[in-house]
Amino acid sequence: MVQWISPLDNSIVIASKVKILRNIKGIKFTKLLNEEEFNDLLSMVLGRLKEIDILDKCYVVKLKDGEEKIIDYYKENFGLIKYFENKDNLIFIMNKNGEFNILLNEEEHIGIECTNSGLSLREVYSKVDKLDDLIEEKIHYSFDSELGYLTSNIKNLGTALRTKVFIHLPLLSSNNLIRIIKNALKEEGITLKSIYNSGNKDVGNIYEVSNIKTLGMSEKDILDSLISITNKLILREKNQRDNLSKDEYIELKDDILRALGVLRNTYSIDRDEALKYLSYVRLGVELGIIEDLTLKPVNSAMIEIQPDMINNSSIKRRDIQSLKIERAKIIRNALNT
């Protein structure tokens, strides 16, 4: 499993993720392929990947047939479950060691992605780039000398590189600075958004920082920009923590320990309340207030309590009350061991 769940330190940055998108020269975009054309594409790509010994180290799973392994995939990739338009034809090629994943027929013909803990964008990109170079030796990509890599979505033209950092910003969020920061980052071609929401409200204080532009920038420029922005966010969050008054710190410490007490003893809890308290607990670990926990069980709990994750682990879909009870059980098991 990818190591972001077991971080090496109590970092504010949870994980870094890089994804590159590629289309194959002379083949219609994914959304335009019929069943026969897709099967031809799949056969060709898998054949070429065998030639470079990638598949020996991977699981090859169709989304509609491999639910259990796909659940593990989402856990490894920060639990971002979404619904795919072309579910029947989506293929996951998952490295057995969790080093990378290749998606066939998702947004484009080929998507190569990797996730790892902390602020490690350059290291993660290096892995993806090496794999991309290997594949390109066997497959001719759609490329234009002026536009770069050609994609069905104009937003991905150019490098077709997507970079993301997942970061915990509880103090910036509680002081209502997030909206101001979001607007400022848009001007720099960066998106900041909560990965968990309830209506229009951010929940859980975990944010995704990602690049918007892929055209007109080099891969190095994109990586440098996101790393620079992330470091500024880290500094601003740390400043908020360091500048707490004595009374504010006491109040925060009380909130953290109350949250830990609730989560370790709750019998039934809804998702939003659980994420709120897990954010407090995570902050407590980051600040050294909670000493008998690491971030690993907190990270795992944040993923496993999502409704889709709970339902996917059950034979039948649960009702709301059953979900709340099972969610509380997951949290108790995570935080009491």
Curated annotation (Swiss-Prot):
It comes from the Bacteria. GO terms for cellular component: extracellular space. Its EC number is 2.7.14.1. It is an enzyme of class 2 (transferase). InterPro entries: Arg_Kinase, ATP-guanido_PTrfase, ATP-guanido_PTrfase_cat, Gln_synth/guanido_kin_cat_dom. Residues 12-240 form the Phosphagen kinase C-terminal domain. The keyword Transferase applies. SUPFAM superfamilies: Glutamine synthetase/guanido kinase. GO terms for biological process: phosphocreatine biosynthetic process. ATP binds at residues 15-19, 162-166, 193-198. NCBIfam families: PRK01059.1-1. Belongs to the ATP:guanido phosphotransferase family. Catalyzes the specific phosphorylation of arginine residues in proteins. This is Protein-arginine kinase. The lineage of its organism: Bacteria, Bacillati, Bacillota, Clostridia, Eubacteriales.
